[in-house]
């Protein structure tokens, strides 16, 4: 009985071992299959020689495209001309009216002040008045008149040059010179300086440090007409004909020069103490130049104006500095205290 049981147990153990061997054999087959699949997958993912060549070609092409092109770009032009910034838009030159209006507008923004309209009714030298000293005074023969002056000591700059700038529908001219186009770069630069209240380089070379009086006339509704040559009558010092004893006479070239004369007889001047020169721009556009002592007061300047021009005796007017534009309200101040030595002051009617 014991032997039979042992044999049965042996049979059972052998069966279990066989089953285990079969199971392990099955597991080993599955692992082997998986490994074969992985090997096949790696082989499929491994690039071929052709794939490597194509990838290398793409890499070279990308690097070439990333490099900046050294070929010139045609049709691209960068211009930085001052006249193009100021007078052109979209490649077009603005109308003459716009150019002229901008000139007056910007000149006013740079310190120009309107002159009293009474200058129109006075009839004395009514024309385009403008720019004196180291700045300008802008004017117009019809509606617009502006004045702009800056800088000190305008009397020690040497000669004085009077220039008339006429603005036409088809260009501008200086004095009786030739027509100059608005679209020309040099001419546009000239006008740009005027707009800024600066002396154009062209005029600086002309006066060599002298004083510039630049008049502006608005003729934008007219085309330029070349002026006829004018005969200038003799003016200055000469001899009177028909006199037994030749008499030396002096004829001023214009009424304006009469007002430029020093009227020292109107002022009690002490030559033994320091003096200064004051230029007075009157409301009618004319001017007076007078020497004063530093101790003279603003009220003395007012009295001088009334004595020199009696038509202002019944007028109420104010005196102002030019740059900045400040009314001289305290007339008991001396010229030195008011800080107006060797300067230009304005008369404005109230």
Swiss-Prot record:
Residues 1-46 are annotated as: Disordered. It is found in: Nucleus; Cytoplasm, Cytosol; Endoplasmic reticulum; Golgi apparatus. Keywords: Cytoplasm, Cytoskeleton, Endoplasmic reticulum, Golgi apparatus, Nucleus. Residues 1-29 have a biased composition (Acidic residues). It holds the Pfam family UBX. GO terms for molecular function: ubiquitin binding. GO terms for cellular component: centrosome; cytosol; endoplasmic reticulum; Golgi apparatus; nucleus. It comes from the Eukaryota. InterPro entries: NSFL1C_SEP_dom_sf, SEP_domain, Ubiquitin-like_domsf, UBX_dom. GO terms for biological process: autophagosome assembly; Golgi organization; membrane fusion; nuclear membrane reassembly; proteasome-mediated ubiquitin-dependent protein catabolic process. Residues 271-348 form the UBX domain. Residues 32-45 have a biased composition (Basic and acidic residues). Residues 160-225 form the SEP domain. Its main location: nucleus. Belongs to the NSFL1C family. Adapter protein required for Golgi and endoplasmic reticulum biogenesis. Involved in Golgi and endoplasmic reticulum maintenance during interphase and in their reassembly at the end of mitosis. Regulates the centrosomal levels of kinase aurka-a/Aurora A during mitotic progression by promoting aurka-a removal from centrosomes in prophase. Also, regulates spindle orientation during mitosis. This is UBX domain-containing protein 2B. It comes from Xenopus laevis.
